[in-house]
């Protein structure tokens, strides 16, 4: 959520920047009217409160003098009713202002290139050379089925489309990838591993920005009876959601920052709006595993932290010897809450292209303001909002796809990357 003071004092400038850099049309007229009315109600409630307090004191003085206090009592009661009405109207208006503010995307950093869509993203670097094959390349679906490890038909029977059943050595390889990523990030990159709930409440989803705007992308639980919103849950679309919300409503000592957390979880997404896209294989699933990286940092450290976090995700690809490229997303392709995002795209031989395998974002104070996540300096004891960052380190299913396709042999076997062999009992090939 953007700084309310920014919306109050620089509304036109913010609207202009959002339109130019995000293509987002801010409802300036409504915001301006709401702010004008808020100021009037604020003054009115403060005036009524002061007058009621003054009259209440007069009751005591009049009573001490032996005077009739009933007229004053009636006046105080009338003032109280007016104050309650004004407060209720002010509360309702502030909720309306907040509801509108929750739909406004974050402002892009000035270093982010202008652009309407992914075609205008900026390639930053490439690592590794795509392998040349002297045989017909198979895709991961064919390779996985040849190994008896990917069963999409069974998943359709159990659940439906965009799910998979993994078996045997393919399931083991999938597990090995996640374990390798966790060990790397915890033992070499300084992250603390966390086990988090896969179901979260609505307040948590508001905190990281999935609600109210992206509710249709979530899988929600449906209580059998009407219950309060606080008791309704949704499956997590990413471990970013529970990990980041661990600092919600907290005041952290600045000396304890950065906080670096990682978790391996399944992720659940409805893929609303993705009908007909990537219908074959593991690329776009309703349920997939991911190792997530989250950092909570001081505001002045967040841009450097983004570079560091992205490097941590890149290290996974480099150790697996998977060719990839690093892309800086343009303003039109960035996520709702991000101020700057790098995508890592891995080479997939069967598609003859690079595909996203990680997205690393600096959310600035956008999530922290929603969550009221703050830090306090030991020197002056003042509090300020933290900055939050997140990234995939990596998407496990897509990494499995990349390993299957990049390490395939002419006979359909899959060579196990060297760094994964200790997790596979020394196995060198699958199939």
UniProtKB/Swiss-Prot annotation:
Pathway: Aminoacyl-tRNA biosynthesis; selenocysteinyl-tRNA(Sec) biosynthesis; L-seryl-tRNA(Sec) from L-serine and tRNA(Sec): step 1/1
Residues that coordinate or bind L-serine: 238-240, 292, 392
Primary subcellular site in the record, as a coarse category: cytoplasm
Enzyme Commission number(s) of this protein: 6.1.1.11
Reaction equation(s) it catalyzes: tRNA(Ser) + L-serine + ATP = L-seryl-tRNA(Ser) + AMP + diphosphate + H(+); tRNA(Sec) + L-serine + ATP = L-seryl-tRNA(Sec) + AMP + diphosphate + H(+)
UniProt function note: Catalyzes the attachment of serine to tRNA(Ser). Is also able to aminoacylate tRNA(Sec) with serine, to form the misacylated tRNA L-seryl-tRNA(Sec), which will be further converted into selenocysteinyl-tRNA(Sec).
Subunit structure: Homodimer. The tRNA molecule binds across the dimer.
Protein's name according to its UniProt entry: Serine--tRNA ligase
